[in-house]
From Swiss-Prot:
The keyword Magnesium applies. The keyword tRNA-binding does not apply. Its EC number is 3.6.1.23. It comes from Fowl adenovirus A serotype 1 (strain CELO / Phelps). InterPro entries: dUTPase, dUTPase-like, dUTPase-like_sf, dUTPase_trimeric. NCBIfam families: dut, PRK00601.1. This is Deoxyuridine 5'-triphosphate nucleotidohydrolase. Keywords: Hydrolase, Magnesium, Metal-binding, Nucleotide metabolism. One of its GO terms (biological process) is dUMP biosynthetic process. It is an enzyme of class 3 (hydrolase).
Amino acid sequence: MDPFGSSSVPPCSTSDLPEPKLYFVRLSPHAVPPVRATHGAAGYDLFSAYDIKVPARGRALVPTDLVFQFPPGCYGRIAPRSGLAAKFFIDVGAGVIDPDYRGNVSVVLFNFSESSFNIRRGDRVAQLILERIMVPELSELTQLGETDRGASGFGSTGMGAVDRNQRSVLEWLTPGSR
C-alpha cells in the first residue's frame, strides 16, 4: 500500500482547465515519439534519431528529430537518464527548451569514460520534463535583506553535519586538500 495515496503521478492539470497537451512533429522517419516509461514517470523518454559515436572524454550532439509545442505556461527541461550515467559514465548536458522554440530538439551527451560510446538510432538518451514557468517583474534594489546564511555557499550548510570519516564537498573542490 502506498502511504502517499497513489503509486502514479497524474498529469499536471486542474479540473477547471482543459487537459494539457504536448504537441510534437517528427522531422524524419527516424524520429521516435516521446514515451513515458511508466504511468508514474515524471518525464518523457527521448530517443536518438541517428547512430552517433560519443568519443572518449568527449561530447556529441544527438538529434531527436522532434519539434515540440508545450502547454501554455510550460517549458521543457532535458534531464539525464540515470542508467546511462551509472552503467556507462554518459551524462546529459542541461538543456532548457523555451516554449517559443520550434527547432529540432537535440541532446548534448558527455562521455566521462576512457572508451568511445556508440548511440544507436532508437536508443533512449534523455528525458523531457515539463515544468511551469514563472516570469516575475524585475525590481532592482541597492541591497537585499539579511539572512542567517548570508553569502556562504558551496557546502556551507553541510559543514556541521559532515562525518569525520567522510570528506566534505569543499575538501574535494579545494586544491591541495586531499
